[in-house]
């Protein structure tokens, strides 16, 4: 009885405090924006959260991922192509939009571009009268999806690729897509550029200056003048960035910043993009691209290898839930349809997410907070389900506690946190705690570091049953601005599924190697099995940059020369926070 009474008193006290501050401070200014901040179109883009990729073209029929550029256009002949089937499937799977590969690296165009004969206009599809870009654009309008285009800068078909003349051809393609197919929400530029190709029959390897050849500033100017609402994707943005992998996840630490001018399409330090640049001066949030199958294009032998709904759910939590967006690819099959296995798994994935995050246990509750700015920026804004209202601290306060008390103990295993990103990304570290049966606060055991929040942070943890939960912001770049908090019970199977997924995945932190030159050290983290870092001596120091939660250590021996540099015995030690004391890990 005493416990129940104290909880009620706590709840009433928090309500009273909020009411007094709201009445007494009606002209409080919002916190000043903390640079860099997003453009409004970048905020709207991130609110989409999940959207689809469609890879479809000659590669679908020649069983390749990267076509050489010499497959005849006549090979393209989908018998039952139905863009409305694509749109219906994507809506049922919770996708908010779709990006179509209008032209992949092989140079084949899915629309009748007048500048080439290598397009649907010279294929059997609809007797050369088809236009898949238009068909999908119209299907999107009918079913309420946003539409976007992928256009490969690299073209293995064009004879003049690598010359200034090719740029005129490429710019004309881009202008055609931007002016004739309605509004697009994104334009996608691939980082794969230059290499071997057909090139009009030359059959040779061509290299380009990936940073300067395409004159991206001119391209961006064209895009902004024709489709100002569109977000531009490339390795370095400027609208949104590649996340640095094609496995669909961002780092648990993920800043929406990059250092301006440093990252470009084909950037050779792509591992940085998984985490962003904490010292960046340009807002470029991460897009996490992944295919529902092993390949980006359809291959019949992969029908049994489609990602399960549970695997897709895991990717959602590690992309959207790690301050990114999820771009999920659907390889359209040779009939011109999204395969039924892909469709069923994607729809079930969406249903699971809806089920797990259906009921917010703190909706409408006003938490007790250790600091409050007042005016409109009060604690009640954290649970009012309004994106544009937010709680904020006073200017000098960069740490705070947010405490929820429940009338009785509840089971919980999911949490949602959101910062109000129009004013910038701020939080650098936080913890989550629950109140045990004795009234003491205990840490919620999480499988990942709790550093950044950004647009959205989703946390999964083994169920706790408690009458109180607390979020403690322990470090930030400036005064805090949070607009939503959610706490959920994902159901009885949540713990089992969560544990199974955790056992099957691995996520690496960025690191530097002491005593190893930069070129050799890069080989240790580039995820390329063909490169190897060799170390002189028998001591290797791995610097993680800051204190981290580490659950395992993995290394891959040299794959080129199996007998070179193999480790037969080793000891692993870790340094304390002050880096003065080292202890062996047993």
Where do the model's predicted regions map?
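Noncatalytic modules at the cell exterior or secretory-pathway interfaces
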Residues: 462-474
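Mature catalytic domains of secreted/periplasmic carbohydrate-active enzymes
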Residues: 26-398, 403-404, 416-425, 434, ...
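Short coil-to-beta strand junction motifs in C2/discoidin
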Residues: 423-431, 562-571
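Bacterial N-terminal signal peptides that target proteins for export
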Residues: 2-11
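Predominantly extracellular/luminal regions of secreted and cell-surface proteins
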Residues: 359-384, 495-525
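C-terminal motif of bacterial Sec signal peptides marking the signal peptidase cleavage site
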Residues: 21-22
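A short beta-strand element within beta-rich, extracytoplasmic domains
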Residues: 410-422, 471, 549-560
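Extended extracellular/luminal ectodomain segments enriched in beta-structured repeat modules
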Residues: 398-399, 407-414, 466, 545-552
